[in-house]
Amino acid sequence: MTDMPSVTTPALDRYAVFGNPIGHSKSPIIHGQFASLTLQPLSYEAILAPIDGFEASLRAFFQAGGKGANVTVPFKEQAFALCDSLSAEATLAGAVNTLSLLADGTLYGDNTDGLGLVADLLRHLGSLQHKRVLLVGAGGAARGCILPLLKAEVGQLVITNRTQSKAQALVEIFSQVQQGRYSDKLQAMSMPELSGEFDLVINSTSASLAGELPPLPQSIIGNKTACYDMMYGAKPTAFNQWAVQQGAAQVIDGLGMLVGQAAKSFALWRGVEPDTSGVLKLLRDKLQADAQ
């Protein structure tokens, strides 16, 4: 009787998402689906890091063999500070959502939020070229999206915020880092100053989560305007409901951005970009089921 040859299962590369809270995270589901789809040997888990212990938690993960990590609220700025090298998107965002441990042991940081947004917008709209775009909000979510939107060749990008000085500061920071590039396409305006219809209005604020609305003039929405809320839920967000009432041609929520940024992170780590349509449908169906 001959011995059967032993079959060794290849070790799974470890990835994780760090946050606090983290129980709500859909990242393990998304990356698990991506791994199955692309036949990549990896595991992906959610790790609750103590508010005052993110760095220690992250270092322990990498010392135990972790290959890469996603970072969510409230640790994106801390992750930025820990990186040895950064992408242009991360530098401009001042925040990191994707960490990679390089072969030399150093930490590389990227921000794929804006790339995920643009990927979802292109999926819905086909092109952003020459479009007049309004970005509502001047926080971290907005910062991460400016460069990807401009790289997508929008015609004009206007940033508006309740506190106008924050929008203006964001434009100035961007202009300094980019040494004046795109200055002809980027500007800040106060909400009362806004005039004329926009092709695309993006809400980067979390106001919808509280059922609130930024005080935007109705005149910015026309019958060809697409509106995008980075927030999402089982029902249309407060912002998207308002946009429909103003006659917007199309409203889109941020679930596709969530899946899109995850796909960009996955591609950064594994060298293959997964198709997002199946995962997006799975999450959308789950949202609807959980709401019933």
UniProtKB/Swiss-Prot annotation:
The keyword Transport does not apply. Keywords: Amino-acid biosynthesis, Aromatic amino acid biosynthesis, NADP, Oxidoreductase. It holds the Pfam family SDH_C. One of its GO terms (molecular function) is shikimate 3-dehydrogenase (NADP+) activity. The keyword Amino-acid biosynthesis applies. Shikimate binds at residues 25-27, 72, 97, 113, 232. NADP(+) binds at residues 137-141, 161-166, 230, 254. GO terms for biological process: amino acid biosynthetic process; aromatic amino acid family biosynthetic process; chorismate biosynthetic process; shikimate metabolic process. Its EC number is 1.1.1.25. The active site is at 76 (proton acceptor). Pathway: Metabolic intermediate biosynthesis; chorismate biosynthesis; chorismate from D-erythrose 4-phosphate and phosphoenolpyruvate: step 4/7. One of its GO terms (cellular component) is cytosol. It catalyses: shikimate + NADP(+) = 3-dehydroshikimate + NADPH + H(+). Homodimer. Belongs to the shikimate dehydrogenase family. PANTHER family: BIFUNCTIONAL 3-DEHYDROQUINATE DEHYDRATASE_SHIKIMATE DEHYDROGENASE, CHLOROPLASTIC (PTHR21089:SF1), SHIKIMATE DEHYDROGENASE (PTHR21089). Involved in the biosynthesis of the chorismate, which leads to the biosynthesis of aromatic amino acids. Catalyzes the reversible NADPH linked reduction of 3-dehydroshikimate (DHSA) to yield shikimate (SA). HAMAP family: Shikimate_DH_AroE (MF_00222). This is Shikimate dehydrogenase (NADP(+)). The gene is aroE.
